[in-house]
Amino acid sequence: MPLRRFSPGLKAQFAFGMVFLFVQPDASAADISAQQIGGVIIPQAFSQALQDGMSVPLYIHLAGSQGRQDDQRIGSAFIWLDDGQLRIRKIQLEESEDNASVSEQTRQQLMALANAPFNEALTIPLTDNAQLDLSLRQLLLQLVVKREALGTVLRSRSEDIGQSSVNTLSSNLSYNFGIYNNQLRNGGSNTSSYLSLNNVTALREHHVVLDGSLYGIGSGQQDSELYKAMYERDFAGHRFAGGTLDTWNLQSLGPMTAISAGKIYGLSWGNQASSTIFDSSQSATPVIAFLPAAGEVHLTRDGRLLSVQNFTMGNHEVDTRGLPYGIYDVEVEVIVNGRVISKRTQRVNKLFSRGRGVGAPLAWQVWGGSFHMDRWSENGKKTRPAKESWLAGASTSGSLSTLSWAATGYGYDNQAVGETRLTLPLGGAINVNLQNMLASDSSWSSIGSISATLPGGFSSLWVNQEKTRIGNQLRRSDADNRAIGGTLNLNSLWSKLGTFSISYNDDRRYNSHYYTADYYQNVYSGTFGSLGLRAGIQRYNNGDSNANTGKYIALDLSLPLGNWFSAGMTHQNGYTMANLSARKQFDEGTIRTVGANLSRAISGDTGDDKTLSGGAYAQFDARYASGTLNVNSAADGYVNTNLTANGSVGWQGKNIAASGRTDGNAGVIFNTGLEDDGQISAKINGRIFPLNGKRNYLPLSPYGRYEVELQNSKNSLDSYDIVSGRKSHLTLYPGNVAVIEPEVKQMVTVSGRIRAEDGTLLANARINNHIGRTRTDENGEFVMDVDKKYPTIDFRYSGNKTCEVALELNQARGAVWVGDVVCSGLSSWAAVTQTGEENES
């Protein structure tokens, strides 16, 4: 039956007829044309409305609950009267994160309802644990459920970031420049430099990446290299990429250790996508709480309260993002109306995991193309020429309970290779990692590592081993090494002790050994700073050479306001040196860190080495570049100087701006229009960034959602009124550069005394400016906010006559007293008041 809109007349009849729904008249009073449904007399007008059909709200109600205060709306139902029989035509469910959820069986029963009739009690049974009850008196439908019919409101483990907020062509260019000079002892020198550029140009979710470097700029040995030229679209959980890139930039889900150096021209496709965000901070085993009514859930561990969360009626997964990592038990306490309803113990399973996290769906990727293999050499003994080959492969990764795994199968140069990686946490203290490779030319590799936290939490231990045997085709070297190490936190045994670390590395292929032992202790920590003690020993040998032993001991003094000082001694190469180091950090300004170090031999034979060496460095953060300048004179007599600088440029249409930051290859250009050194702040996802001058560029990480809010800076005396563009919500993909152009007014609070041309005071006069008005007091004094772009005050009198005050506010900031000012155009205030002319006063 087609839906019909109620006519105005029918609506009036319906409203009149509703009066009868709340009264149970006796038979003698009932209208002869009315009928009775479920014990309620239905007037003719309302009966006609039911025959046309109407929508009523659907609420979920827990069986046994008193009243409807905890009922939740979960949708709507369309009911109609068919030949005296009330029916449900369809149910429309409305999903909400805060609402209770029904079980899948109950959901299917609801969605399958079509022209289902109500019985005489106005009820439709669905399952043994759920039924629909219609109240004609309140015109609402209740889904009455037992606890068994409730589903569980689980927290989403993944979310697509959605469409890009930037619909026009834009680009981000990151640059990294370096230059270094070596002065030799004999007076010679050499200088070299490089410039690395990474450009990402995008249109919405489509982007092209160009990555390359220039070497030896300004010298006779200039060179250039293009590392990547690739088109990419990563959207809605799938990623496609095509172009050229070197093997160092090859993206794969699984390990690919047998790929030799070279360049690949090919394509890849899969669901390993950054546009889908996986939340791995929740417990792999959901913590579930049932609430019979709205209330609180308390999580407690070892008597310590970890979290308090509020929920409505139903089964809910508790948010465990803020809980500590590990595997442990928590006590889940449900409190309703101040009373403890239930208490039970559940297990939290939160482990650090690679990739998309525990519980994420299977990830896959296929790729292939042409492979240019670079010339390869192993210690000059075994060489292979450059070669062209094909390349094809597939990668996949996933998890099973706490086990995370990844696998890759690929082929090139007529060789087939398979690789796997497994990560398995055992309890909360042990973590096992295994990585294996097997190739068709009999090459194989096995890498294993175990890390453990020993009982008591005061010590940890790790063991690594790698063994590789290469056949006659793969361009890779054999390996046979092992390492073991650990850390002992003695502070947990006695507060005056520190931390002791030891490690041993053994490379059996090259017959080299390496031992280290380090100790650190905090000697003092208080108002005046902190003092730490460092000591250690290193011993290594390489092949048949004699063992080389180095020792050091140092005191590190950290002072307030970013000051740091260290003094100590080292013994190496047969002589002992005294070392001094100092560092100063700054919160503001272009120079952020300066430091220096000085070393002098105090005993032993230095041989050809100098007895005095040292250096200095500075880290800078300027508007268009940030980096480090370093000068160092080594013991061997060489003087090394190097400068590195990096930054970013963002572009969209006619807007272009630069920054010394390199936070990502997306960003935002702020066209604030601030004059001189004016400053406001941008609050982006809770972080505060300063904005100076007319235009700023702020690089941001791609594949992210950002909430941007402009506000006054706490470090500036200026006050600004951000009229429009204060808040923005952005979704940025690689290469997306958004432009925010707020309307900003620089405000100055002006106070003074206003006079007419003859010097009389404008007492109790209403004066105006560009953004507001105020009234002077009996002495002609005023206080008002003025927009610096419109530094005028005017006063109207005698109808259309005005006088005006021109304020000099170019150097004014915050608040200013302007003293006596003259309202030009008003000869005398006394004349205005004596004539009684109508004015704004």
UniProtKB/Swiss-Prot annotation:
Keywords: Fimbrium biogenesis, Signal, Transport. Induction: Negatively regulated by H-NS. Positively regulated by IHF and EcpR. Residues 1-29 form the signal peptide. It holds the Pfam family CooC_C. InterPro entries: CarboxyPept-like_regulatory, Pilus_assem_C, Pilus_assem_E-set-like_dom. The keyword Ribonucleoprotein does not apply. Belongs to the EcpC/MatD family. Part of the ecpRABCDE operon, which encodes the E.coli common pilus (ECP). ECP is found in both commensal and pathogenic strains and plays a dual role in early-stage biofilm development and host cell recognition. This is Probable outer membrane usher protein EcpC. It comes from Escherichia coli O157:H7. The gene is ecpC.
